[in-house]
Amino acid sequence: HGIILYNRIKPHTSFRGPYESGLMKMMAIGLGKQHGAESIHHQSPAIMHELVEEYGRTIMENAPVLGGIAIIENAYDDTYLIKGLSPEEIITEEPKLKEISYKTIAHLLFDKCDVLVVDKIGKNISGDGMDPNVSGRFVQPKYCSGGIQAEKCVILDITDETHGNAQGVGLAEVTTRRLVNRMKLEMTYPTGVTNTFLHLMKIPMIMDNDREAIQLALMCCPEAEDHDHMKMIRIPNTAHIGVIEISEGMLPLVKNNPNFEILTEPYDLPFDENGNLF
């Protein structure tokens, strides 16, 4: 009898090191369930990268770990690579796979925008509800960076699969009454108790519908370069950014860029009679 680990390897959302999200962290935090996660998270984030390796190696020395299956995903949330690793290879190969994952994960191909609108966040999308390596909204900017720089972020809803856990909503400035009505505190708060990132659970400004939420964010961007041509990006979630919506103010940035294909003529956002997009 023994343990075979199975996990995807990807950049972590709140620390950087040789082992980030993957098999080593799964042993340190995942297999330890709530207690394991809590015992690591309640120590300084500055040494998180060291703890993950320490805990992982200790578990391999004391538990019958037979090996692991590592998966890397591509930018379209599909499988890019599957690799079987012996316990020794978890130590030597996982850091190399992590480096590959940095190249294969999705990125919004812009440095910055005024407003980022995210239709839905959820634990099935990212541990933080939305992946900061895409959204640029890191739990601990002191230890991590990347993604797009948006002056304001709007989150419109949570996924059905997250069962009311709205962790990550606190990373936005504006949200909707719909999201807050669907948020279950008893599903959301235990995550914060475990990981200590209590600001992930904060409630942003609540607007009655999607239109008002987006309008508020657009009104409140003092750093915008051109207030008549605001730069806004709308994505369904951070895992699916192959097709995105951009405002006309961003058209000059994509017109001559071979990485973009313009799929439609400009159109108005399709708000329904209640001011919502869905």
Ranges and model annotations:
Residues S14-Y19, T79-G84, G127-D131, A166-G168, ...:
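Short acidic, glycine/serine/threonine-rich loops at helix termini
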Residues D131-F278:
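C-terminal non-catalytic interaction/assembly regions of soluble proteins
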Residues D114-V118, G122-S126, L200-M205:
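Active-site rim loops that border cofactor/substrate pockets in soluble metabolic enzymes
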Residues H1-G122:
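Conserved, well-structured core segments that form the ligand-binding/active-site neighborhood
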Residues Y76, G122-I125, D160-H163:
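Short, catalytically relevant binding-site loops at active-site mouths
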